[in-house]
């Protein structure tokens, strides 16, 4: 969000908090070498509203109240069928329509994984009786009753006694789960919303089928631990967006889209494994309690904590772009630079989603004229230690090629070997003189 210049919109409405954790074991990230070494507590509906406002600022239309009912595709494009009988022509279709994705099913993309072993209800409601506030762990699972805002609705989290129910949850379902756990439903009434989630873990076998791609929950579902689902979905979009724009804009070949699956599928596969591990640690028998205590001791040590916290926060993502400098395939740090004109932050250079060749060596040492219509060339100096959240201090390079998603596509260490190939691979062939 900071890379696009909109982080302040979220910071002004959220609450800085220590929200990183593994199976509810806190993971402190305050010593991470990043500008935002903390979590931000902000409800999802607020996040959606802020993003919708930004989309409106960019002049992108959102067609609400119209559902996709099907599509056809051929070599020329996609025809999207809508619930009002209309159809939309498009070059590509990206299914971001959740775990029950119609787009994924219609594309014939398999969704293998693991069935649920536990089921939870979460809701905002009113209670007629004073409840047992706070967190509760018992043989059924983990439950909590809280009032996040003074005078506001009660937030309920309760484990259902029998997993496997499907469909939209009802007030009756919630009442039955409360009775099973607390012996009473506390006179629950007036729900603002009720939602069900499970520990089902599934991932699309492929993120692309022809001109159809998947992102977010349509591509992967898992237990909602540590906010990873939202983070991974946003990172899917950030990875895919600029690639799709270049292909549609005819600056890159269609094969660039294949790198989306190659990069993002392993990331989500790892998230599925870590969330399954967390569910196992949240079980409430004595043996699991012993394992949880042992895990908590391990995560109290700096090295295991830093490694897992980087993974849980998304700051440790590393795309396999080959061997080389430790920065290759990792997110570029938001360095404070000195340029001929003024001080500058690296993330400021990414606000308009254009790639950047950042030259930290002698000014004028690079000529990228054949890509100048697509890639910014910035001569700058950086004084200080270069550190990454996942791996610590690393050698400072003389130049880095930064993709629009903030990940490093090439690193120069007093050499330009491989730069032209990287420019062509990621940003299309050179423009003829």
For the regions a language model picked out, list residue spans one by one.
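Core Rossmann-like FAD-binding/catalytic domain of the broad FAD-dependent monooxygenase superfamily
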Residues: 1-303, 378
């Amino acid at each position: 969000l900071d890379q696009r210049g909109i982080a302040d919109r979220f910071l002004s409405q959220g609450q800085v908090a220590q929200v990183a954790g593994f199976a509810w074991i806190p993971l402190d990230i305050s010593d991470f070498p990043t500008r935002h070494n903390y979590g931000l507590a902000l409800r999802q509906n607020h996040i959606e509203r802020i993003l919708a406002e930004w989309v409106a600022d960019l002049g992108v239309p959102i067609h609400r109240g119209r559902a996709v009912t099907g599509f056809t595709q051929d070599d020329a494009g996609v025809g999207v069928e809508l619930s009002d009988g209309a159809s939309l022509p498009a070059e590509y279709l990206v299914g971001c329509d959740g775990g029950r994705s119609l787009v994924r099913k219609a594309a014939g993309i398999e969704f293998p994984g693991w069935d649920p072993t536990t089921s939870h209800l979460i809701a905002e409601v009113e209670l007629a009786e004073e409840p047992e506030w706070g967190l509760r762990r018992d043989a059924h699972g983990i439950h909590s009753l809280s009032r996040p805002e003074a005078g506001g609705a009660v937030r309920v989290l309760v484990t259902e006694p029998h997993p496997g129910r499907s469909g939209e949850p009802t007030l009756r379902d919630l009442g039955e789960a409360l009775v099973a756990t607390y012996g009473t439903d506390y006179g629950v009434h007036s729900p603002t919303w009720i939602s069900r989630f499970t520990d089902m873990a599934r991932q699309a076998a492929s993120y692309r089928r022809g001109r159809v791609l998947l992102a977010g929950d349509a591509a992967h579902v898992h237990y909602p631990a540590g906010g990873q689902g939202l983070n991974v979905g946003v990172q899917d979009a950030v990875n895919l967006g600029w690639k799709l724009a270049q292909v549609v804009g005819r600056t890159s070949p269609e094969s660039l889209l294949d790198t989306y699956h190659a990069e993002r599928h392993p990331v989500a596969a790892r998230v599925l494994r870590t969330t399954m591990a967390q569910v196992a640690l949240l079980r409430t028998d004595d043996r699991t309690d012993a394992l949880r205590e042992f895990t908590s001791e391990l995560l109290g040590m700096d090295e295991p904590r830093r490694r897992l916290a980087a993974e849980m926060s998304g700051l440790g993502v590393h795309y396999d772009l080959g061997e080389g400098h430790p920065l290759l395939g990792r997110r570029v740090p938001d360095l404070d630079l000195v340029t001929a004109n003024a001080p500058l932050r690296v993330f400021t250079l990414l606000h308009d989603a254009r790639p950047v060749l950042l030259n930290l060596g002698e000014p004028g040492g690079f000529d990228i004229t054949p890509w100048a219509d697509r890639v910014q060339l910035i001569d700058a100096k950086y004084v200080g230690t270069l550190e990454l959240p996942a791996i610590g201090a690393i050698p400072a390079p003389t130049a880095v090629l930064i993709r629009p998603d903030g990940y490093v596509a090439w690193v120069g260490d007093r050499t330009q070997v491989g730069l032209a190939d990287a420019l062509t691979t990621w940003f299309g062939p050179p423009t003829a003189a």
